[in-house]
């Protein structure tokens, strides 16, 4: 009888490939008795559970994925599958957060800050398309970056993108409130007030 977690995993994977899911599941469990921190065993059990779709399969699959993520936080596949399960239940905001947790660490924070600072430089010399490219890149990796949300709002306003400017101003203020970081509030409020003044001017001239 195999007494080695690697060998047990290989046997389990072989059974899984042949479609013998019950035997595969049993061998993954045995591997976990030898090594409770075997993240891939939890991940593979999640895949089996999803494949079989038995009673409460979503709950079981999520539990296995959470075990895997606890051991290997930045294992992309487990996070992607967790996000997919959340989206199936229309929990899109939670799904976005799960994916953000693996996207953010992809690059060093200093690298992202350099892109943000270059975007600010572009914005200040009027190169708005280039600035927007940099700000959107930062948004991809750090969607909660208040300074970047401020620059996105200002850049969109400068380019005449009123809806986008207002959108980023409002979510920026919400994010600032959550983080208790208010150094960009003046910029957010200026964009909102200027758009509000523009809308009143349009109403008066009609």
Residue ranges and their predicted role:
Residues 34, 71, 105-107, 141, ...:
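Structural marker of alpha-solenoid helical repeat scaffolds
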């Amino acid at each position: 009888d195999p007494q080695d977690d690697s060998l047990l995993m290989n046997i389990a994977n072989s059974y899984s490939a042949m479609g013998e899911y019950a035997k595969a599941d049993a061998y993954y469990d045995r591997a976990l008795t030898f090594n409770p921190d075997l993240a891939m065993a939890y991940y593979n059990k999640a895949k089996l559970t999803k494949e079989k779709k038995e009673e409460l399969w979503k709950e079981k699959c999520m539990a296995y994925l959470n075990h895997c993520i606890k051991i290997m936080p930045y294992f992309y596949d487990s996070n992607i599958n967790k996000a997919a399960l959340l989206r199936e239940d229309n929990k899109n905001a939670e799904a976005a957060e799960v994916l953000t947790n693996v996207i953010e660490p992809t690059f060093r924070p200093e690298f992202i800050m350099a892109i943000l600072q270059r975007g600010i430089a572009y914005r200040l010399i009027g190169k708005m398309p280039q600035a927007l490219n940099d700000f959107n890149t930062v948004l991809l990796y750090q969607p909660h970056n208040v300074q970047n949300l401020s620059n996105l709002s200002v850049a969109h306003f400068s380019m005449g993108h009123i809806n986008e400017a207002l959108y980023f101003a409002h979510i920026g203020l919400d994010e600032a409130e959550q983080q208790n970081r208010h150094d960009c509030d003046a910029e957010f409020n200026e964009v909102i007030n200027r758009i509000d003044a523009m809308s009143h001017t349009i109403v008066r001239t009609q």
